[in-house]
């Protein structure tokens, strides 16, 4: 099992100390939720935050792109130090091509689905994925109640 707490709930003025506490508590990775205000109704971290965490810590950074157009940002997050990048099944873009682009940069790949998306929707993408993220809440906000769907 890999413990990968999200830094989304941290005080944005104290991300460095929040990351240090996660590591001290035994986190294996740090999960970085990236939101664009379109795919989900919230905004969060940019590649510069991932770069800052990468420069200060050696822990793997698991970047979750909740973006309408992740293809525009994948290379920037790879360069910033992402260890893995997750994209969503529900986007309109060519998901397979995005996953290939991520892998070509030496970064692990993952695909995610929202709670009501059928699991079999991701079957064609599995050969291109190192991981799968099954959302237990609707993406966009931290601290939600678990959805047993």
Where on the chain are the PLM-derived regions?
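A short, mixed-charge helix-start or loop-turn motif at secondary-structure junctions
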Residues: 1, 139-140
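Short gly/ser/thr-rich secondary-structure transition/capping motifs
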Residues: 112-116
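Conserved N-terminal beta1-alpha1 strand-loop-helix module at the mouth
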Residues: 1-86, 92-94, 100-104, 108-109, ...
